[in-house]
C-alpha cells in the first residue's frame, strides 16, 4: 500500500485521516493515511524522513504551509500565487511538487451548493493566508467583483496587488463597504474565538450566501450572526475541508472522489 499523511501541530483534531480513508474505500484505492505531528522546529526533517520511508504524498496544515512552500522543488501556479502549500506529491522522477488545493476546495463546495460565482459580487473578509489561498480560484470563476476587507487595510491592498491581473479585485476599509453582496466569505479565525467580523448589516440581503471557512458541530458565531441579519443561505467550512482533500486525493491518485458523499458522513460523524 502507498503511504500518505497529514502534517500539523497540533494534529490530533485533524479530520484528514477520516476523510481520506473514506475516499480510498469509495475509489478502491489501496492507501494508508496517517497523521504526523512534528515539533514546530523539526518539520523539514520529519518531511524528509517521510519521503525516504516510501511516502508518496502528504497534506500540510498549520503551522507548516509556508515551510512546505519552501521545501517543494516545484510549485504549481496556484501554489506560487497562494504563497503556501497544503499538498505535496512525490513524482515517479523523484521530484516533490507543491500545490495548494484550498481555493479549489472552496469553489467545489460552493458549486456543490449551487452558488453562482460568475458575475457575482463577492466580499472576502480577512487578508491572511486563508484569504490568499482562495483569491486565485475565486477570480478564475469570473465574478463581477471581489472585494477584500481586512482590519489592517495594507494587507488587503497587498493581496489586490498579487491578484490584480487575474480579475476585478479591490481592497476596502470595513467602514467604507457599501451595496449588497451575492456572497460573503469569512476567512478569519474569529469564529474560533466566539467573535464576529465588524461588517455592516446592510451588506446582507436574504439572498446573500454566507460562508464561514471555520466549522464546528454547531452553527459558527459568524453564521449565527448572519442568520440574525436575515441571511437564509449559510455554509461553513467543512465542505471546503472535504473539497480540498478531494482535490489532493485526485492529484495523488488520478481519480476524483465524490466529496458530497464523504461530507455527509463527516457531518454525521461530528454530530455524534
Swiss-Prot record:
Pathway: Metabolic intermediate biosynthesis; chorismate biosynthesis; chorismate from D-erythrose 4-phosphate and phosphoenolpyruvate: step 4/7. The active site is at 65 (proton acceptor). NADP(+) binds at residues 77, 126-130, 150-155, 213, 237. GO terms for molecular function: NADP binding; shikimate 3-dehydrogenase (NADP+) activity. It catalyses: shikimate + NADP(+) = 3-dehydroshikimate + NADPH + H(+). It holds the Pfam family SDH_C. Keywords: Amino-acid biosynthesis, Aromatic amino acid biosynthesis, NADP, Oxidoreductase. Its EC number is 1.1.1.25. GO terms for biological process: amino acid biosynthetic process; aromatic amino acid family biosynthetic process; chorismate biosynthetic process; shikimate metabolic process. Shikimate binds at residues 14-16, 61, 86, 102, 215. It comes from the Bacteria. One of its GO terms (cellular component) is cytosol. Involved in the biosynthesis of the chorismate, which leads to the biosynthesis of aromatic amino acids. Catalyzes the reversible NADPH linked reduction of 3-dehydroshikimate (DHSA) to yield shikimate (SA). Homodimer. Belongs to the shikimate dehydrogenase family. This is Shikimate dehydrogenase (NADP(+)).
Amino acid at each position: 500500500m502507498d503511504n500518505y499523511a497529514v502534517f500539523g501541530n497540533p494534529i490530533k483534531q485533524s479530520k484528514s485521516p477520516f476523510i481520506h480513508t473514506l475516499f480510498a474505500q469509495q475509489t478502491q484505492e489501496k492507501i494508508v493515511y496517517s497523521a504526523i505531528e512534528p515539533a514546530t522546529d523539526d518539520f523539514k526533517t520529519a518531511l524528509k524522513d517521510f519521503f525516504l520511508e516510501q511516502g508518496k504524498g502528504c497534506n500540510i496544515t498549520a503551522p507548516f504551509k509556508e515551510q512546505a512552500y519552501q521545501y517543494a522543488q516545484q510549485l504549481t501556479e496556484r501554489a506560487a500565487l497562494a504563497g503556501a502549500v497544503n499538498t505535496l506529491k512525490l513524482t515517479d522522477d523523484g521530484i516533490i511538487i507543491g500545490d495548494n488545493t484550498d481555493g479549489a476546495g472552496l469553489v467545489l463546495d460552493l458549486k456543490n451548493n449551487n452558488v453562482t460565482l460568475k458575475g457575482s459580487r463577492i466580499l472576502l473578509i480577512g487578508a491572511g493566508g486563508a484569504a490568499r489561498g482562495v483569491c486565485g480560484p475565486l477570480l478564475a470563476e469570473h465574478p463581477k467583483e471581489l472585494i477584500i476587507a481586512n482590519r489592517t487595510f495594507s494587507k488587503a491592498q497587498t493581496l489586490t496587488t498579487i491578484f490584480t491581473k487575474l480579475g476585478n479585485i479591490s481592497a476596502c476599509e470595513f467602514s467604507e463597504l457599501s451595496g449588497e453582496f451575492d456572497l460573503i466569505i469569512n476567512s478569519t479565525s474569529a469564529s474560533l474565538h466566539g467573535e464576529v467580523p465588524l461588517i455592516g448589516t446592510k451588506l446582507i440581503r436574504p439572498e446573500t450566501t454566507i460562508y464561514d471557512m471555520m466549522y464546528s458541530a454547531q452553527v459558527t458565531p459568524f453564521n449565527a450572526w448572519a442568520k440574525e441579519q436575515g441571511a437564509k443561505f449559510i455554509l461553513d467550512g467543512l465542505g471546503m475541508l472535504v473539497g480540498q482533500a478531494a482535490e489532493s486525493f485526485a492529484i495523488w491518485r488520478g481519480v476524483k472522489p465524490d466529496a458530497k458523499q464523504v461530507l455527509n458522513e463527516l457531518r454525521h460523524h461530528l454530530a455524534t
